[in-house]
Amino acid sequence: MAEPIELLCWGGDWDLPSVQTDSLTVLAYAKFAGAELTVKFVDWTWRTITASVPQIHYEGTTVTEPTQILNFLRKQRFNADFELTAKQGADTMAYIALLEEKLRPALLHTFWVDAENYANLTRPWFTSHSPFPLNFFVPGRQASLALSRILLTKAESPLLNITEVEGKIYSEAKECLNLLSHRLGNFNFFFGDTPTSLDAFVFGHIAPLIKAPLPSGQLQKHLNQLDNLCQFCNTILKNYFTDATAEKRMDCSPTVAHDPVDANLQKLTQLVNKESNLIEKMDDNLRSSPQHRPHRHEAKPSAPASDRNSTPA
């Protein structure tokens, strides 16, 4: 019997299988690709304090980072992207890069830097899931790392402190969410009725923002106005994580009428398209190599998507 693939990741709350973005991404992709993982939830211990979570352990090999874990699963013939075209594969890479550049800094700020959220939600949660004496200093250490990452990537002159950077990162995050909503349109998933790695990454980034009981949530309020993204998360939770989470729907605000796509959204769309075209050209040779047909996962049937509108790539 083959050794099971073991996944170490953060545990869940707020009706989510995990509260951490990267852990959610890997858990979702494994479900989409039909990978049977032995999931072990971890807390901060002396062994894991410097470790990268999530982690895959298999036959003496340890794999970290979501992109590397997804590549590992593909090599094991668990490939949720098998049926994507070269253009769709390039789009996937471009949108994942956009998430990391535009949305991740705002998520870090929301959960780890915003004083009200950190004091009333983030610190108490991670303190309660960390053993003594790590619970006294580990949350503060993570907050410092989050702040350093934000300033390192976003504090370009003349934006030299977190107060000045804050407006910039939230503005970019809202533009990113608008673009994702526009790209998703009326589809169930970003490439139709079948979820792929892009859906896993988007789910991992926006699900905690939707579900967490944030005392201070300007980005959460903006996301709750994008009804199709809320429904997107709700569909994934219902179809793939019913046993791991409570069977209640996302508490999303009613659909709010939006203004036509503004100039910033058009520029962001053009940027993603340009990066996607470049990746597609670089990817041609790789995709021409032979591939194994992946395992398929039979998801629970969901209601048909509403009338489809064409959306920009």
UniProtKB/Swiss-Prot annotation:
It is found in: Mitochondrion; Mitochondrion outer membrane. One of its GO terms (biological process) is protein transport. Residues 280-313 are annotated as: Disordered. SUPFAM superfamilies: GST C-terminal domain-like. Keywords: Membrane, Mitochondrion, Mitochondrion outer membrane, Protein transport, Transport. It comes from the Eukaryota. GO terms for cellular component: cytoplasm; SAM complex. Pfam families: GST_C_6 (PF17171), Tom37 (PF10568). InterPro entries: Glutathione-S-Trfase_C_sf (IPR036282), Glutathione_S-Trfase (IPR040079), Metaxin1/3 (IPR017410), Metaxin_GST (IPR033468), Mito_Protein_Transport_Metaxin (IPR050931), Sam37/metaxin_N (IPR019564). Could function in transport of proteins into the mitochondrion. Part of a large protein complex spanning both mitochondrial membranes termed the mitochondrial intermembrane space bridging (MIB) complex. Belongs to the metaxin family. This is Metaxin-3. The gene is mtx3.
